[in-house]
Amino acid sequence: FRHCPFNDLRVVFLGYDPYPNLVNGKPVATGLAFANHKETIEERYSPSLRVIKDSISHYLSWDKGINFDPSLEKWEKQGVLMLNSALSCSRGITGSHSLMWRPFTRSLLENLSSFKTGLVYVLLGSAAQSFEQYIRQDFNFIIKCRHPAYYARTHTIMPNIWKEINDILISQNGYGIEWFNQFKT
């Protein structure tokens, strides 16, 4: 919430819960859904983040020389809120705090979708899609897709939600999200 002010908000990604594991004694979770730490090298991206990057690369035909920020902070600065339906979990136990966070997430989505219209909500996976009923659909847009972990398990490419998001944003305010920062020199 800190780097994505309410007035600048354009897209809300909703995932499941933070990564429950540690790598080299450091939590993988960063506070942004699907993000990895900035210093994470590509070979060590979490499976979900790798699927997201590969999907964007596939559909945008940028298969080399791209500059992808694994922290996803560049997206956040463009008005993309990377949110999980649960904001914590016990180490090593996926979904362990999901019931505890459900009322908070429900209230957040109800209020957000009522007071900030024209947002694109991207619901990734069945846990996120269970919150669809709390989003005002008369003034907002909803895109649903399987969770990136599914595509990691099946070794398949996510659908082109990136173009769909940008098409909506461009029709609303003339510009989309820059998913990749720029070409490396």
Q: At which residue positions do the language-model features occur?
A:
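A polyanion-binding, active-site-adjacent surface
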Residues: 1-135, 141-144, 150-153, 159-168, ...
